[in-house]
């Protein structure tokens, strides 16, 4: 029987309902900003970062978590003796700052939240040093200061051998016209930036697949990839801050940005407006994702609804700017390509990939 994210215990319909309830309640608190000389700009609720508007700048705030990728690191360490906590620390920073930049904010400060079931977790010096070094490296890649954090011991809440990694990030948009407002128009080009692998989403399903493989995380990926399954899963996430900074430096207008995380390619239609996002140049799925689909097995539609499938970030730009945006990405070390276009089709909202026979309608994404 084919595996799915839902069968692994992750149900977005339940999670998204709670998120919508939080957004509705949160709106009732926005009046508090006036006492600080700030205001809530229109359309910020439901975006990847929350904006606060000042006289000549915006502040942006994000709280995010790693998820369960560190459990893969623990399992692989038990098999190989190598710690991957430098990698998962970079992942943790990436989850925050990649959301932050979608509104045009550049990261200023990042804080770590590291909750453990037992303070003895920190007695493993090699693991702890790797975690610290990786978090600092992630902040350097993001151009942000590591401002602090919290290390609670939560016995009875967090299982004894585990750690829960998360944090928050503060960003700033200045001048204000660098804000990315979602001004997407029919005919806009969609530019994809490559991911490093699964990055931080879909790991619950990936762990379930490992549990049913005879060699587990030591299974070769194949398809031309020399790594084991565990090694491939633990490749650190790409941090896309330098791309946005370079586009701003070159004066390139970005109409919208999407961090392709939970909900897979459905995230490409996060905007409320009814557009059809047509992906006309999908690349072949990288080796790791082909392995996942075969080993699960995971059906094609489920794979693209869950994983990034090799695409970590998407930029929506005027078609005449697409070559310049791709050049800016490549100049800062990213693999980028023209992947598709935005079109109108009445009130329809969807992501369509004709070459793969895939269409995700708007009702398959119930949260912004």
Predicted regions and their residues:
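Glycine-/charge-enriched secondary-structure boundary and capping motifs
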Residues: 2-9, 14, 24, 124-142, ...
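Basic, amphipathic N-terminal segments that precede the first structured/catalytic domain
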Residues: 9-35, 39
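Glycine-rich phosphate/pyrophosphate-binding loop regions near the starts of catalytic domains
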Residues: 31-196, 360
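Acidic-glycine-rich active-site phosphate/pyrophosphate-binding loop
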Residues: 59, 65-69, 219, 282-293
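Short helix/loop capping segments that flank catalytic or ligand/cofactor-binding pockets
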Residues: 69-71, 177-178, 200-203, 266-268, ...
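Short, acidic (Asp/Glu-rich) active-site segment that either coordinates a divalent metal cofactor
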Residues: 176-227
